């Protein structure tokens, strides 16, 4: 008898269901007696023993289904060692649920915060496999996370649609793309859609340089400009502030503007006199059916996770490295953020194409 647990934690994205399907089908086709426990709403289900038994039927037809059949929630890693409102030790409660069900392995799907808790449980002696999920593609140790390319498709489509209206009305349009700390999604969607300016957290922008790029286009006869702006884009003068002052500055901006894009729009309008419009696709970027690439990626990652379980190899994240699915020790990757190198090939190639990063 093989008993495994599954949970999805953190923000949802495409291909969570497809990845769980890959794990379960990979095991079911190779194990005679298999029990699968699905923990509801992320780590909450593990903490409060909220789970249900899953059968093969539950994984039929979900390859193309967005969201997660188990539900999800955010349980910040920094609070995992803090007792809940009733004094419950959350870590001990998770261990108790795991041992009560006699699990051989717990498979955890999630992003950076989820991964840190997964590593904590590994350190506490549980058999853990982590599968990297996020539209941000910011998990260290894997070239690609499932959900990323699906989100790139959606963000690209949004910018493509804006192109037609921007060119018709001779306006400057800002499309705000998800990504508080890293700019992978904005970078790829910006390149894919032919954006004229890309602003990401890793490359602090100079508003004068941004306006210069817009004016240059106008001088060349282009009456419209498209900016792909990450929600975590930051001005050079703000990036130079000490941590406490930066936090205060960001709080001031948040009080005055719905998001950073509106601040940038106001500044560009004041300096150029051009009409600016802001579009925010928001949570649409996480929704819908996974793209074909993500369906393949999630199936491969899930299948490899199944093989690790069959081989009784635990304590790993399963990721993609140089086009091959690999196992990466959780202790090596947990807590590390994969950011965009300002000198990355993609950035330099985009600049060669005339795309401005405002630097």
Predicted regions and their residues:
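Short, acidic/small-residue loops that bind anionic groups at enzyme active sites
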Residues: 31, 121-145, 199-206
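Short glycine/serine/threonine-rich phosphate/pyrophosphate-binding segments
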Residues: 12-23, 46-47, 91-92, 103-119, ...
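Glycine-rich oxoanion-binding loops at beta->alpha junctions
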Residues: 48-106, 146-153, 157, 359
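Accessory alpha-helical/coil subdomains and C-terminal extensions
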Residues: 97, 108-110, 116-120, 148-166, ...
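C-terminal non-catalytic interaction/assembly regions of soluble proteins
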Residues: 256-359
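N-terminal phosphate-binding or glycine-rich loops at protein starts, especially the Walker A/P-loop
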Residues: 1-50
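Short glycine-rich or small-residue beta-strand-to-loop segments that form or flank ligand, phosphate
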Residues: 3-11, 69-71, 104-108, 173-176
């Amino acid at each position: 008898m093989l008993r495994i647990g599954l949970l999805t934690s953190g923000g949802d994205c495409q291909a969570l269901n497809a990845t769980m399907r890959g794990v379960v089908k990979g095991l079911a086709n190779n194990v005679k007696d298999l029990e699968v426990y699905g923990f509801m709403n992320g780590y909450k289900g593990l903490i409060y023993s909220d789970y249900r038994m899953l059968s093969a039927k539950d994984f039929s037809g979900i390859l193309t289904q967005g969201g997660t059949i188990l539900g999800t929630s955010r349980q910040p890693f920094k609070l995992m060692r803090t007792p809940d409102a009733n004094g419950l030790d959350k870590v001990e409660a998770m261990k108790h649920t795991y041992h009560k069900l006699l699990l051989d392995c717990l498979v955890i799907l999630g992003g950076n915060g989820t991964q840190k808790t997964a590593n904590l449980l590994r350190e506490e002696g549980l058999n853990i496999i982590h599968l990297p999920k996020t539209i941000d593609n910011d998990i260290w140790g894997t070239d690609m996370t499932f959900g990323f390319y699906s989100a790139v498709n959606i963000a690209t489509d949004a910018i493509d649609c804006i192109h037609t209206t921007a060119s018709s009305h001779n306006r400057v349009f800002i499309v705000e793309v998800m990504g508080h700390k890293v700019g992978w999604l904005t970078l790829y969607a910006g390149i894919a859609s032919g954006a004229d300016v890309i602003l990401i957290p890793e490359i602090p922008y100079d508003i004068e340089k941004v306006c210069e790029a817009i004016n240059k286009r106008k001088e060349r006869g282009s009456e419209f400009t498209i900016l792909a702006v990450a929600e975590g884009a930051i001005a050079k003068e703000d990036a130079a502030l000490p941590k406490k002052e930066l936090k205060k500055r960001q709080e001031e901006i948040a009080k005055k503007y719905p998001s950073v894009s509106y601040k940038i729009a106001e500044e560009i309008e004041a300096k150029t006199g051009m009409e600016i419009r802001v579009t925010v696709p928001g949570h649409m970027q996480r929704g819908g059916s996974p793209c074909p690439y993500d369906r393949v990626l999630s199936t491969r990652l899930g299948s490899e996770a199944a093989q690790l379980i069959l081989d009784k190899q635990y304590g790993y994240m399963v990721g993609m490295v140089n086009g091959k699915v690999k196992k990466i020790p959780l202790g090596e990757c947990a807590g590390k953020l994969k950011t965009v190198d300002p000198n990355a090939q993609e950035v330099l190639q985009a600049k060669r194409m005339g795309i401005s990063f405002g630097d």
